[in-house]
Amino acid sequence: MTFPDHRDSVGSVHDLLVAHNIPGIEGIDTRALTRRVREHGTLLCVFGPSEKVQEMELILEELTPPDADDLVAQVTCNGPTLLNPGAEDSEGRPLPRLAAIDCGVKHNILRELCKRFEVVWCPADMPLEEIIRDWSPDALFASNGPGDPAHPGAATEARKTLAAAVRHGMPVMGICLGHQLMGLAAGLRTYKLRYGHRGSNQPVMDLETRRVYITSQNHGFAVEDPVQGMLAPHPSGACSDTSDNVLGAEFMVRHVNSNDGTVEGLDLLDKPAFTIQFHPEACPGPHDASPL
C-alpha cells in the first residue's frame, strides 16, 4: 500500500487514503478474521496501530450497536411534500394518489412510484389521520429504511400508521423495513439475522406461483415464520393469525428466501395489502421483481 508497483502509477494507495482522510488496514490474517465472523456473525469492531491495542479495547467496550439509535428518525423527510402534482397517465387521466411513508426511502423508489402515482412524500411519524385529512390518498406505501424495526421511535410510529391504514381498508404495500413493520403489526416477532442479506443475487420464491425471483436486498433483520419459528422454511404459506395482530385481518406467508427459508413477503387475505422484504425496483440490481 505504501509503494506503487505499476509503471503508470502516480502515487500509492497509502497517500491516496491519507489525502482523503480514509483509514486503511494491511498485514492482518484475513483467514482468521473470516473464521471469526463465520462463527460469531456480524460484529462491532475497531482497528488501529498494533501498539494501541489496549486503547482500542476500551473504545470497543464503549461502542453501542447502531441499531440502538432511532435511525429512521435520522433519515426520514422533515415534512410532507407532493412530488408530482397533477400527474396523469398516457391518456391524460389523473393518476391515483399515494402516500409514501419515508422510513429511509431510496430516491429511485420515489422515481418509480411517480411513474404510477401522484406521490405524497410523508415523514415516518406522520399519523394516518393527518395524512387522510391533508392529502386524501388512495393508497399507502411503507418504504425501506435502516435499523431495528422494533425500535420504540419513528419506526413504531410508522407501524401504527401502517396498521391504521390496513384497518381503514386502504390499499397498502410495504417493502423491506415496511415489510417488517407489517409483520410486527400482524403480531409476529422480528429478529436480527446472524448474517444479513446483502447483494443483488438473493433468490426468493413465490409460494403461490412457485416462481423464483433474483432480488436485491440489504437488511439485517427478518420477520419470524408464524408456523415454524425463526429461520425455518415455510412449507405452504398457510393462513396464520396471532393474538397480537392489530391489523384486523388474517395473513399468509407469500414469499420465502430460497437460501435460508426466512420470510420474504406477506399477503393479507381479506384486505388489499401485501409486503415484500426485497427491493423490487433494484437500482442497481436485477429487475425480476419490478412488476410487483
Q: For the regions a protein language model found, what residue spans apply to each?
A:
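Gly/Ala-rich beta-loop-alpha elbow adjacent to hydrolase catalytic centers
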Residues: 174, 178, 183
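Structural motif
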Residues: 139-143
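The conserved SAM/SAH-binding core of class I Rossmann-like methyltransferase domains
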Residues: 101, 122, 175
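Short glycine-rich anion-binding loops that position phosphate/pyrophosphate groups of nucleotides
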Residues: 144-148, 178
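Amide-donor transfer/coupling interface in amidating biosynthetic enzymes
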Residues: 1-98, 103-117, 125-136, 152-168, ...
